[in-house]
Amino acid sequence: MKKIMIDGEQLTLQDIIHVTRNFYEIELSEDAKNRVRNNRKVVDRYVEEEKVVYGITTGFGKFSDVVISKSETEALQRNLIISHACGVGNPLEEDVVRGIMLLRANALSKGYSGIRLETLSTLIEMLNKGVHPVIPEKGSLGASGDLAPLSHMVLVLIGEGEAIYQGKRMSGREAMEAAGIRPVVLTSKEGLALINGTQVMTAIGALTVYDAINLSKISDIAAALTIEAQRGIVTAFDKRVHEVRPHAGQISCAENLNRLLEGSTYTTKQGEIKVQDAYTLRCIPQIHGASKDAIQYVENKINIEINSATDNPLIFSEDNDVISGGNFHGQPMALSFDFLGIALAEIANVSERRIERLVNPQLSGLPAFLTEKGGLNSGFMITQYSAAALVSENKVLAHPASVDSIPSSANQEDHVSMGTIAARKAREIYKNAVNVVAIELMAAAQGIDFYEGYTLGEGTQIAYDTIRNKVSKLQEDRVMYFDINQCANLIFSGELIEAVEKAVELQ
């Protein structure tokens, strides 16, 4: 079994994918183990000396002024977890749950949270053995961290709650017993250390960003196919145009289009048939490129967050100091994930408009709705309806969650981020966008089939062949949702991008 070493400093987005989807195991580095041990000594000293320190010898939130005795330490930590496990809704997907466990373990391995090494090791053992807590998707305010969903994770760690183990849903205690893992009895600071962080929103967001990077490339592929089906003008993608407005995403998109369309005889030059195309063709680098830049921005923020200490209070063992701060606040990620959702919504917006250009005979010069016997057959008519519905839904979802805040804990926690809502929305927008782009891929391939005697580009030929391997040309009306699902799966699975990138490097 392949392993990834974690130390709170060097985790990457690709590491997250390996652990969440390829089931790599994780292991603590020796340096991380030493940091955790040394950090814990400070907590033990404060408890022994009965110093009043938030989260170690006090209650939580509004109860931060209530002092807790040494004899009540274990009860305090247990009560924290069981009282905070108030999530509702459907369980989060397996890859998200694995991401949450990984990111929390990595944050704790930095050695600022005061957790015992054996407790952290048990969380890692759960991940490695595939004990996946059932974590409801809703209930987090995104400050003080993802308290409710992370509490559901910790329930299983202490032998409570529910988990999925080897494909079966069972009680947390049953899952731990079946996996041969001894549940933990939490002691001072540990409950708070485990649930006070942004790992739920960040896990959802990290997976979505990874997928969004691939979707941004596939949207370039879909656009290139549409350009060919429309006999579009490639002069607009001349690198000189983009070098004088040097946004990185714009330049990358123009380069992608040029590489994909290299050798195509479907495409035209400026003035050959017409002077210029509509914006949804001519401005693809500017539109797609802006989304690429936004996705890159969010990826950069994620790379910081996945290697950050997001607990409160933080324990600085070298200075023998404990400081209450606000690193649990999800605002940096909330704004980022709202931005991500907007970027993905725009990918779908422009894709749907290109679908309209393909199915509308007044715009395309192709048979109406891409069918030869219009009237008897409806062809691609309703696929555009579906795309329009998804795009409209995305416009609602793209409203930022981070502009909202509802005070909690008797106004002690009087500003919250709603970052987990932002991450969940971005994930839903991504799924909708995939289906819109899938419809464009199908429609563009259908449009191309009405031409004879032309050659596709180096990249678009591979894309076309991959699509046609799953979805045949529409000769007469058939049940289309099967085709949409097949084409969407080419995107979700990575099959399409892998096939194209074997021949054409995309950015």
UniProtKB/Swiss-Prot annotation:
InterPro entries: Aromatic_Lyase, Fumarase/histidase_N, HutH, L-Aspartase-like, Phe/His_NH3-lyase_AS. It catalyses: L-histidine = trans-urocanate + NH4(+). Keywords: Cytoplasm, Histidine metabolism, Lyase. GO terms for molecular function: histidine ammonia-lyase activity. CDD domains: PAL-HAL. Pathway: Amino-acid degradation; L-histidine degradation into L-glutamate; N-formimidoyl-L-glutamate from L-histidine: step 1/3. Its main location: cytoplasm. Gene3D superfamilies: Fumarase/aspartase (Central domain), Fumarase/aspartase (N-terminal domain). The modification 2,3-didehydroalanine (Ser) is found at S144. It comes from the Bacteria. There is a cross-link at A143-G145 (5-imidazolinone (Ala-Gly)). GO terms for cellular component: cytoplasm. Contains an active site 4-methylidene-imidazol-5-one (MIO), which is formed autocatalytically by cyclization and dehydration of residues Ala-Ser-Gly. The gene is hutH. PROSITE patterns: PAL_HISTIDASE. Pfam families: Lyase_aromatic (PF00221). It is found in: Cytoplasm. Its EC number is 4.3.1.3. GO terms for biological process: L-histidine catabolic process to glutamate and formamide; L-histidine catabolic process to glutamate and formate. It comes from Alkaliphilus oremlandii (strain OhILAs) (Clostridium oremlandii (strain OhILAs)). This is Histidine ammonia-lyase. PANTHER family: HISTIDINE AMMONIA-LYASE. It is an enzyme of class 4 (lyase). Belongs to the PAL/histidase family. Transmembrane segments: none annotated.
